């Protein structure tokens, strides 16, 4: 049974996973309580593409670089990176850019977006009132830059190993949205981060199709390739409701999904990926998930 309305349009957005090869840790930010989208959740730096971003290059890549600078003070440059931490001039410019994104053009001769690795694309489920098509990029660095946090948008930051972040969220320490769990789990299983480019999901976006379990606060997000994923009009599917026996993970069927509890927010996210068809195996990075507990 389908319930609720569908939001047919979305805005373009970009997110960046800042990953240190030496420590194998990534930068995570916690959204503030007043954030319009996913408040009080741990996320990667990122935000909406601005109309001025296209003036400097690929609008998604430029937006990723700009948002990283706005939220963390870390700037991707042609020589690696710079940080506004303990740099009054850069701190002042960062504040100006937060208030007026067009001022990012002042850094056009300094910034570099070509070094970003295209990692994945997620589209917000159709039942959400605010939808985004978000391109995720990976930026690899040799050392962890000092962070100059934008406290008007974020409440805290943390350098943390990907698996540790996922485990702490599962234990209830903080809320971690399913896309972040998906990307961190993938990244944690890449042994050599210098080879990350070969694991990017660049062929097909992931638009989760949510199913609510009747009588429970359990949500199932079906991804492309899952046997319950609806391919026709796949980006505009409304929320469905099903009994527990219908939506329970089947170890004998092609499966690509995330499950979580809506209370507490994004509680105990579990990923499943098994028995995908060849075309979906080619389209999506294959990695270990909770499916190993079933097979």
From Swiss-Prot:
Q: What is its EC number?
A: 3.6.1.-
Provide the binding site for Mg(2+): 67, 71
Needed co-factor(s): Mg(2+); Mn(2+)
Looking at the record, the residues that make up the Nudix hydrolase domain are 9-182
Q: Does the keyword Flavoprotein apply?
A: no
Q: What class of enzyme is it?
A: hydrolase
Keywords on record: Hydrolase, Magnesium, Manganese, Metal-binding
Motif Nudix box, residue numbers: 52-73
A GO molecular function assigned to this protein is: metal ion binding
The answer to whether keyword ATP-binding applies is no
Q: What does this protein do?
A: Probably mediates the hydrolysis of some nucleoside diphosphate derivatives.
Q: Which family does it belong to?
A: Belongs to the Nudix hydrolase family.
Question: This protein is called what?
Answer: Putative nudix hydrolase 7
Q: Which gene encodes it?
A: ndx-7
């Amino acid at each position: 049974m389908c319930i609720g309305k569908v939001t047919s349009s979305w805005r373009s957005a970009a997110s960046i996973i800042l990953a240190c090869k030496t420590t194998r840790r990534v930068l995570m930010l916690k959204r503030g309580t007043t954030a319009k989208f996913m408040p009080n959740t741990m996320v990667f730096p990122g935000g909406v593409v601005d109309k001025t971003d296209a003036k400097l290059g690929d609008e998604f890549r430029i937006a990723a670089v700009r948002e990283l600078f706005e939220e963390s003070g870390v700037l991707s440059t042609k020589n690696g990176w710079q940080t506004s931490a303990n740099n009054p001039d850069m701190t002042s410019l960062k504040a100006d850019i937060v208030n007026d994104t067009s001022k990012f053009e002042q850094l056009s001769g300094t910034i570099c977006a070509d070094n970003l690795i295209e990692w994945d694309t997620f589209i917000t489920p159709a039942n959400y009132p605010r939808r985004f098509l978000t391109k995720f990029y990976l930026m690899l660095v040799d050392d962890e830059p000092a962070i100059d946090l934008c406290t008007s948008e974020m409440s805290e930051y943390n350098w943390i190993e990907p698996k540790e972040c996922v485990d702490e969220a599962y234990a209830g320490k903080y809320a971690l949205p399913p896309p972040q769990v998906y990307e961190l789990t993938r990244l944690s299983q890449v042994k050599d981060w210098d080879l990350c480019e070969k694991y990017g999901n660049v062929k097909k976006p992931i638009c989760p199709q949510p199913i609510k379990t009747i009588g429970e606060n359990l949500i199932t997000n079906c991804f492309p390739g899952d046997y319950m994923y609806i391919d026709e009009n796949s980006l505009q599917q409304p929320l469905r409701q099903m009994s527990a026996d219908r939506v329970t993970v089947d170890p004998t069927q092609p499966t690509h999904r995330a499950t979580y509890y809506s209370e507490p927010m994004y509680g105990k996210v579990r990923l499943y990926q098994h028995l995908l068809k060849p075309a979906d195996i080619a389209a999506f990075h294959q990695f270990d998930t909770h499916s190993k507990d079933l097979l």
